[in-house]
A protein has these predicted regions:
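The feature captures the LRR N-terminal capping module
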Residues: 18-65, 164, 291-313
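Residue-level detector of functionally pivotal "anchor" positions at catalytic/ligand-binding pockets or at interdomain
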Residues: 306-327
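Canonical leucine-rich repeat
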Residues: 68-71, 90, 111, 132, ...
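C-terminal outer-membrane/trafficking sorting elements
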Residues: 320-327, 331-398
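C-terminal capping segment of individual leucine-rich repeats
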Residues: 51, 70-73, 94, 115, ...
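Sec-dependent N-terminal signal peptides
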Residues: 4-13
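LRR N-terminal entry segment and analogous cap-like coil->beta motifs
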Residues: 41, 46-90, 97-98
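Concave beta-strand-loop units of leucine-rich repeat
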Residues: 57-64, 81-87, 97, 102-107, ...
Length: 398
């Protein structure tokens, strides 16, 4: 009788011990946990449920893990960072306490975060995600998405979001941040976006939109803005006059024709860069005679004025001084152009504004000739762009 009772008691103990061990079928996942002394606290060859429940942070870095079954036992997990693993999906439905999640360089195609309502920080880099539902993640404060083929991103529910970084997601035409009024930093770069509206983001301090195809950008309501980096876009006009806190600005390599920088604090700029905007002839500034303007990075032929009238007068004066001489005019076969400053390019327009011919010397030149023999007879305009001038002249073709 004693032997029978002992056998029964021993069998129950074995079953109970087995029941307290987390089932982890992926050996690489299991080995990573066993080698983590903060998880495998008794240094045996299994992960007990009690050990899983005690773990708050897990980091996996190129462990060749393809299956995270067993992660559901880590019910108190707060931080999960995965990089370079082989997963295409992951089940986080039992990890209700996760506040920080990072998944980097994986082939994951599906990510369900509907159960993770405590999530505050989300980093997704170089994955295969095309869609992502964040409608239940109301506590999100930080989002960093880099190089994911997302076709849409709905942030309407994430109203406490303070920092948004979305980079190299080239399929996104735009991102709606109209509901995210708590945002202090937005970095949406290299996404090929054609439009971006930040008019509701009144708490914004840092805005980076470089490397897109933006045609317009209105920052008139972003009164707390300190940094604006919108280089390498297609912007033709910018108005910074309302941005009195702005002290860092880069809009190089755009198509700027007008720029109003009269924000009342031009002397506070630690960076001001608008080079490679060949059509920007004059910038509106607080004081066109101020010494600090010499530290601004502008094209050689760009001038400074305090009013539109100033700029118009300066541009006319500058262009008249270096205006090229064209002859013969009318022309039959060849048009000769001479200038006091090096010429860079030429463009002939019809009277309706259509471009008929473009030409460019192999190097900056004081003298150039254009073959106009193929031009139909009539009146045209020729724009001559030089190193320090831009001139439009009327020509007649016989």
């Amino acid at each position: 009788m004693k032997y029978t009772l002992f056998t029964l008691f021993f069998s129950i103990c074995i079953c109970n011990a087995q029941a307290q061990i987390v089932s982890i079928p992926d050996l690489n996942f299991k080995n990573a946990l066993l080698n983590d002394s903060s998880v495998n606290t008794n240094f045996d060859n299994e992960i007990q449920v009690s050990e899983a429940q005690a773990a708050l942070d897990l980091l996996f870095y190129y462990e060749d893990i393809s299956d995270f079954t067993g992660l559901e036992a880590f019910v108190n997990l707060q931080t999960l960072a995965i990089e370079g693993e082989l997963i295409t999906s992951i089940d986080l439905s039992a990890n209700l306490e996760v506040t920080n999640l990072s998944i980097v360089v994986t082939p994951i195609t599906n990510l369900d975060l509907s159960s993770n309502s405590q999530l505050e920080s989300l980093t997704l880099v170089a994955n295969e995600l095309t869609t992502l539902d964040l409608s239940t993640n109301l506590q999100l404060e930080y989002i960093y998405f880099l190089n994911n083929p997302l076709t849409d991103l709905n942030l309407g529910a994430n109203i406490v979001l303070e920092e948004l970084i979305v980079s190299s997601n080239v399929i996104l035409p735009t991102i709606d941040v109209s509901e995210n009024t708590s945002l202090k930093k937005i970095e949406v770069v290299n996404n090929s976006m054609t439009s971006f509206d930040v008019s509701n983001n009144i708490n914004l301090e840092i805005l980076r939109t470089y490397g897109n195809n933006l045609l317009t950008l209105d920052v008139s309501t972003n009164l707390m803005l300190k940094e604006l980096n919108t280089m390498f876009n297609q912007l033709s006009s910018l108005d910074l006059s309302a941005n009195t806190a702005l002290d860092w600005f880069n809009a190089r390599n755009n198509q700027l024709q007008t720029l109003d920088a009269r924000n009342g604090n031009n002397d506070l700029f630690i960076n001001f860069n608008v080079i490679n905007n060949p059509d920007l002839q004059c910038i509106l500034v607080d004081d066109p005679t101020a010494n600090y303007l010499t530290s601004w990075n502008v094209d050689q032929n760009t001038l400074f004025g305090n009013s539109n009238q100033d700029c118009q007068s300066l541009v006319v004066d500058q262009n008249e001084i270096y205006a090229p001489h064209l002859y013969p005019n009318p022309a039959l076969e060849t048009l000769f152009i001479e200038a006091k400053k090096p010429m860079l390019e030429f463009c002939i327009y019809t009277t309706t504004g259509a471009i008929f011919m473009q030409d460019k010397p192999s190097q900056p030149s004081f003298f150039y000739q254009i073959d106009v023999s193929t031009l139909p007879s009539g009146v045209y305009y020729i724009k001559v762009v030089g190193s320090t001038f831009r001139s439009i002249k009327r020509i007649v073709k016989y």
